[in-house]
Every structure is written in C-alpha cells, then in structure tokens.
Amino acid sequence: MKLASLNTDANGDSYFTIVESCDPPESNKEREQEVAYWEIWETQPGYFQDFKPSEEPRSFAVLSGKLEITGSLGERRYFSRGDTFLLQDIGGKGHAIRTYGWEVCTVLRVTMKKIMTGTAKA
C-alpha cells in the first residue's frame, strides 16, 4: 500500500512523497513498524494550526471529517475518512493543518519510533 508522506529536505522545506508500507509483493510479508503510542485526535471544522514541524514521525488514519495539510513550499493535500498518511517532517519549516467541512474531524494518530523510509515506484 502506498502512503503519502510529508518529509523534510536538506533546506528544511517540507515536501510530499510516496512511501511503500509493505515489502515487495513477491515476499508475502507485511512491513512492521515499531510504535511508541497511539491516540485519538478530534477537532471541530474550521480548526487551523499554523506552520510547525512534527515532533516525532506519525501515521494518521482519518476516521471522520476532512483535513488539509500544507507543506512549507505551498503544496496542499486533502484527506478524508478512510485515508492514511504520514507526517515525518521532523525539524525544518513544518506544515499547516486545517479542518473543513461540516463534521468533526477524528483521527487515529500513531507515533512511530522511527521514520518510515522506502520511496514507492510511481
């Protein structure tokens, strides 16, 4: 499964890439990722968080609502119920988050022990 991932480059700018969450299909193995903890994060529509970097690498699974993530170079990605993505922009200029729509945005936020690497082929 391919996941959108927000990472940081050498200049501190955050950019989106794609990370493969599984080992190659012929291996028949799932890729394990150690986690520190998980939590449920809930916000009302219209919530806005200005640019800041992630404190730790995190995986997000949207359970309800809609949110927009903006990287430091202005690229925006939109996520809604059923979407899973990674915020791995440790340090640097960070990202902004905005929730929109009519329903509460509920997200399963999983803090990982290390950054998930392995860019997927397009």
Predicted regions and their residues:
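Conserved short histidine dyad/triad with adjacent acidic residue
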Residues: 21-24, 34-54, 77, 88-92, ...
